[in-house]
Structures are given as structure tokens and as C-alpha cells.
């Protein structure tokens, strides 16, 4: 081109601009949307009563723990009325919608406790529930089983089976939990089942050799997503993986994002003494993606850059 001749910028077609914007928007939706997860938790709240929760420090911590979860399964709720749970729901309802579902009081002696589901009613609903019929009295507190909807086309519902074992019968109860799985999966034709709670599945209550011989360990398809060796206790003097989450089903596996204990004393900067006023256990939790795990975020970032370069 002769020097001095004016150079006019090339006009970018509107269709090109629109396509570029669509690619960027679509990939960003995938990148950001992939981080959205549904959290299911289990927590041995250590003899939860109204007298305990009306203490401000305990109530504040419990509400913060509960607010993290889309479904929380509480154990050791020993209130014969609904007052404890209703009080907690009143504190939670300020920002989001919550409902609850509870079992009857369970136990063989004068000491009895409930299983209580507290859940985000704007994100999930109860489809079915029942108290397992423990005809042989194997369980001290037989599972209170519930089926919940999930915000996922891959897995529209999941079954939760909570259990708080008694320490002297851990092995027997955990082996019987396999029968509960068979019962519920046949009853509702759903093999996407999460077994969770304070199993007492470690230390003096269950030696490693006995743990590895459990039916839930030897039968195919069960995934213990809280690792052996993960401390689920608050006391510095103990290091035991009592609390567990066991998942079954292809849908659960496809949507699994993460599983962990929640170290609430560390998160909320509590001393051990302060934390023990709430519980001597950490909550355990599992996060499910709303869509199947597909392209990892770092690959999506690379794909975004490549797509933009191809568009010029």
C-alpha cells in the first residue's frame, strides 16, 4: 500500500460480535455454574434440648452450622416436644425457607432420641419417608428413611438413611444397615442412597479388621466418602472417624463434588471448651453438583481462550 494512503479500520460484522458474545457467555455459565452444589450434612448434636439451644452462644453456632446445609440430618435430639427444632427454625427462617421432618423418639431404655431432617424447602421437598421396621430389634435407634427431591436432571431424587449406632453393637448394626439399603431400594425403586450419621465406626468401637469385613465394605457399589483416619471429633484427646457418609448409586457418583468434615471450632474460632457446649462431634457433609461432572473448570478456561482465539 502506498505510503500516505489512509487506512480505514475493518468493520466487524454484527453477527461476529454476537457469536463472540454468545461463546463467552455460554462458557462462563458453564465455568461459574459448575461450582454450584447441593450440600447434605449429618451432625450428632449431642443431647440437643431447648434448654441447650436457648443459650445464645450455642444457638448462634448451631444456626451457622445448619445454614450451610440444604439438608441436615440431626442426631441425638432428645426433646420429646417439637420446641427445640421449632426454635432453631425460627432463627433460620430470617433469610431462607426451612422445613423439618422428624422421627418418633427411639431407644430401648428411658433415654431416647430422634432423627430430625432440617431442609431448605425452597430447594428440596420430601417425597417419601418411613421408619424402618426393625422386627428383630437389631438397632437401638432404627433408621428413619426419607427420599428428597434434588435440583438435578441427572438425579431427580435421593434417599437418605441416617443411623446413630450404639457403641457396643456397632458391627451388628452396620451389617444390618445393608438390609435397610435393600429394603428401601426395592420399596422405592431407587438405588441412589446415602447412608450417613454417627456410626461409631472407629477406635475402640470398631477395629479396622472388623470395619473392613462389614457388608457395606465388601459388597460392590458402596463408597465411603469420609476417609478412614479423618477425625470427626472435637476433643484434642481423641482422633476417631466415628461419623461417616456412605454413597451408593451411579447418579450419586456422577454428581459427587466433595465430601468432608466441617471443623466448626476452627471456622468459628471457638476454643475446645466453647465448641463442646455445642457438640463433641464435627458435622460431616457431601456436596452434589446439580449437573454431572463434565469439563473441569481449568479445562473450561482453556476452552474459553481457544474459542476466543478462533473467533479472531
UniProtKB/Swiss-Prot annotation:
Show which residues constitute the signal peptide: 1-35
Q: Which Cys pairs are S-S linked? A: 203-240
Q: What are the recorded GO MF terms, alphabetically?
A: deoxyribonuclease I activity; DNA binding
- One of the GO BP terms on file: DNA catabolic process
Annotated catalytic residues: 113, 164
In which compartments does the protein localize?
Endoplasmic reticulum
The answer to whether the entry has keyword Hydrolase is yes
User: Which spans of this chain does the record mark as coiled coil?
Assistant: none
Give the top-level enzyme category. hydrolase
Principal place of residence: endoplasmic reticulum
Task: Write down the SUPFAM superfamilies for this protein, in alphabetical order.
Answer: DNase I-like
Looking at the UniProt record for this protein, which Gene Ontology cellular component terms does it annotate, in alphabetical order?
Answer: endoplasmic reticulum; nucleus
What residues bear carbohydrate chains? 102, 133, 239
Which PROSITE patterns has this protein been placed in? DNASE_I_1 (PS00919), DNASE_I_2 (PS00918)
Query: Which Enzyme Commission numbers does its entry carry?
Result: 3.1.21.-
Is-annotated flag, keyword Endoplasmic reticulum? yes
| Stored Pfam families | Exo_endo_phos
- Keywords linked to the UniProt accession: Disulfide bond, Endonuclease, Endoplasmic reticulum, Glycoprotein, Hydrolase, Nuclease, Signal
Q: Which family does it belong to?
A: Belongs to the DNase I family.
Its protein name is: Deoxyribonuclease-1-like 1
What gene name does this entry carry?
Answer: Dnase1l1
Amino acid at each position: 500500500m502506498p505510503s500516505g494512503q489512509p487506512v480505514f479500520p475493518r468493520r466487524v460484522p454484527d453477527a461476529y460480535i454476537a457469536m463472540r458474545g454468545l461463546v463467552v457467555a455460554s462458557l462462563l455459565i458453564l465455568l461459574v455454574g459448575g461450582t454450584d452444589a447441593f450440600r447434605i450434612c449429618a451432625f450428632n448434636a449431642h443431647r440437643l434440648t431447648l434448654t441447650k439451644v436457648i443459650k445464645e452462644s450455642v444457638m448462634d453456632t448451631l444456626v451457622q452450622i445448619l445454614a450451610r446445609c440444604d439438608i441436615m440430618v440431626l442426631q441425638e435430639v432428645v426433646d420429646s416436644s417439637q420446641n427445640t427444632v421449632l426454635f432453631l427454625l425460627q432463627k433460620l427462617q430470617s433469610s431462607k425457607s426451612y422445613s423439618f421432618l422428624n422421627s418418633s423418639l427411639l431407644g430401648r431404655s428411658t433415654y431416647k432420641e430422634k432423627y430430625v431432617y432440617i431442609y431448605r424447602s425452597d430447594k428440596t421437598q420430601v417425597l417419601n419417608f418411613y421408619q424402618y421396621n426393625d422386627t428383630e430389634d437389631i438397632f437401638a435407634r432404627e433408621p428413619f428413611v426419607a427420599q428428597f427431591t434434588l435440583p438435578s436432571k441427572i438425579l431427580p431424587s435421593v434417599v437418605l438413611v441416617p443411623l446413630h449406632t450404639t457403641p457396643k453393637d456397632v458391627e451388628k448394626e452396620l451389617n444390618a444397615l445393608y438390609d435397610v439399603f435393600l429394603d428401601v431400594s426395592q420399596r422405592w425403586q431407587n438405588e441412589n442412597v446415602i447412608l450417613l450419621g454417627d456410626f461409631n465406626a472407629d477406635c475402640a468401637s470398631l477395629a479396622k479388621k472388623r470395619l473392613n469385613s462389614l457388608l457395606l465394605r465388601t459388597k460392590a457399589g458402596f463408597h465411603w466418602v469420609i476417609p478412614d483416619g479423618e477425625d470427626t471429633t472435637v476433643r484434642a484427646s481423641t482422633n476417631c472417624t466415628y461419623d461417616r457418609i456412605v454413597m451408593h448409586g451411579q447418579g450419586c457418583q456422577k454428581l459427587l463434588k466433595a465430601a468432608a468434615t466441617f471443623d466448626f471450632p476452627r471456622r468459628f474460632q471457638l476454643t475446645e471448651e466453647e465448641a463442646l457446649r455445642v457438640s463433641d462431634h464435627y458435622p460431616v457433609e457431601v456436596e452434589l453438583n446439580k449437573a454431572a461432572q463434565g469439563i473441569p473448570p481449568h479445562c473450561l478456561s482453556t476452552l474459553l481462550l481457544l474459542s476466543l482465539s478462533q473467533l479472531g
